[in-house]
Amino acid sequence: MILGITGGVGAGKSSVLAILEKEYNAKLILADEVGRELMQPGEANYVNIVNAFGKEILNEDQTIDTKKLAATAFSNPLETLRLNAITHPNVRVRIEWMIKEIRDKEPDALIVIEAALLSEGHLIPLCDDVWYIYTDEQTRIKRIMESRGYSQERCLQTIARQKSDAQFRAECRVVIDNSHSIEETKAQIERHMKKYR
């Protein structure tokens, strides 16, 4: 079974992934990590990103400075679309390869793909089910401020750049409310996991 996990920044996707890994022996595939790997020199997306955004985004050692790339790529929606058009196809190909690797070793493994942009990355067709990890905005702001040291204003800007709650809900069949205690989140996960047995 392949489960897709999505949600906005500060929703607590990591805590849900930790539960799935520990309690259900899930094999995790994190799209952001795959994307970062593919930006390394010699990897599939490196040259195209440098050609698109210029050598100004490079560190002295010729690796991509992700902060400089983010500042450029997220400066306006067209630049974001350009970055996504470069990165998403190869991320999907690498994820398909990772799924095959896992299935070759453990045919019955629970595989979990985590991505904020599951639909934009064309990853939903790979999934048997898709969960949206929901958390109320105030809890998200608190978490982002604690984990990233952002101001409240920067948190709100970050949240505003992402998909809305309604957009996430439209893409997913299951909503996990992660606004409360970890026990409540675990109970919801258990309830939904029972359906797959």
Task: List the model feature ranges, each with a label.
Residues 11:
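ATP-binding Walker
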Residues 36-109:
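ATP-dependent small-molecule kinase phosphotransfer cores
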Residues 96-105, 111-146:
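ATP-dependent NMP and nucleoside kinases share a basic, alpha-helical "lid"
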